[in-house]
Amino acid sequence: MGNELQLENKILKGTTTVGIRVNDGVILAADRRASAGFFVANKMVRKVLYITDKIGITTAGSVADLQFIYDVLKNIYHYNSITKYGPISIKGIATRLANVLSATKYFPYIVQILIGGYDDQPRLFNLDYLGDITEENYVATGSGSPVAMGVLEDEYNPKMTLDEAADLAKRAVFSAIKRDSFTGTGVIVAKIHSKGHEELEFYLNKKM
């Protein structure tokens, strides 16, 4: 129990991520700060990565573990694509990752993963470090998630457009930045839809 609580605390500290699913696609958003304890280790970390043009992944927890998992999932996707099985679905990728996390639960990756994208429809999955998997319409993870989730619960509407969802995700993460010292610098917002993805970057005083 003690080790489990320590792991959960490590996952909760250091970031805020948001995922939103609407009819037009999926939004993945994350702040850019990496912290080591109370020390700001890096102000410009990338926490949103792309397995394909239409599938993204982000995490609360260890960025190094995210990068390793990202490489594994990207290899799985491309291996399937060149075999008789063909491209794997977003649900298939999430299920494969859940199996990996479950198999390593005694020596776990320190992650809370969001996988989102568009295949025949928008999909958004939330996975914890034990391999538990849920499909969500909206979700927030990390140290700033209580603040971000409050914004999402107040304003989420399944009929909102992808642009409206992107704005909501941005505001949810910025709300966390204002209240949570482990979340900071700015926000990357990925808009994933049937034709690919677009990425926006927002900072406290400017848009890039």
Curated annotation (Swiss-Prot):
Q: Does the keyword Oxidoreductase apply?
A: no
**Described purpose of this protein according to its UniProt entry:** Component of the proteasome core, a large protease complex with broad specificity involved in protein degradation.
Q: How is its activity regulated?
A: The formation of the proteasomal ATPase PAN-20S proteasome complex, via the docking of the C-termini of PAN into the intersubunit pockets in the alpha-rings, triggers opening of the gate for substrate entry. Interconversion between the open-gate and close-gate conformations leads to a dynamic regulation of the 20S proteasome proteolysis activity.
Q: Where in the cell is it found?
A: Cytoplasm
Q: What class of enzyme is it?
A: hydrolase
Secretion signal span: none
Checking InterPro entries in the record gives: Ntn_hydrolases_N, Pept_T1A_Psome_bsu_arc, Pept_T1A_subB, Proteasome_bsu_CS, Proteasome_sua/b, Proteasome_suB-type
- By its UniProt entry, which Pfam families does this protein fall under? Proteasome (PF00227)
Q: Which gene name belongs to this protein?
A: psmB2
List the active site.
Answer: 15
UniProt keyword Cytoplasm, yes or no: yes
Put simply, this protein is called Proteasome subunit beta 2
Note the CDD domains from the entry. proteasome_beta_archeal
Q: Cite the record's note on assembly.
A: The 20S proteasome core is composed of 14 alpha and 14 beta subunits that assemble into four stacked heptameric rings, resulting in a barrel-shaped structure. The two inner rings, each composed of seven catalytic beta subunits, are sandwiched by two outer rings, each composed of seven alpha subunits. The catalytic chamber with the active sites is on the inside of the barrel. Has a gated structure, the ends of the cylinder being occluded by the N-termini of the alpha-subunits. Is capped at one or both ends by the proteasome regulatory ATPase, PAN.
| Molecular function as annotated in GO | endopeptidase activity; threonine-type endopeptidase activity
Q: Family per UniProt? A: Belongs to the peptidase T1B family.
What EC number(s) does this enzyme carry?
3.4.25.1
A Gene Ontology cellular component where this protein is annotated is: cytosol
Task: Provide the GO biological process annotations.
Answer: proteasome-mediated ubiquitin-dependent protein catabolic process
Q: Which UniProt keywords apply?
A: Autocatalytic cleavage, Cytoplasm, Hydrolase, Protease, Proteasome, Threonine protease, Zymogen
Highest taxon above the source species:
Archaea
Task: Give the reactions, separated by semicolons, that this protein catalyses.
Answer: Cleavage of peptide bonds with very broad specificity
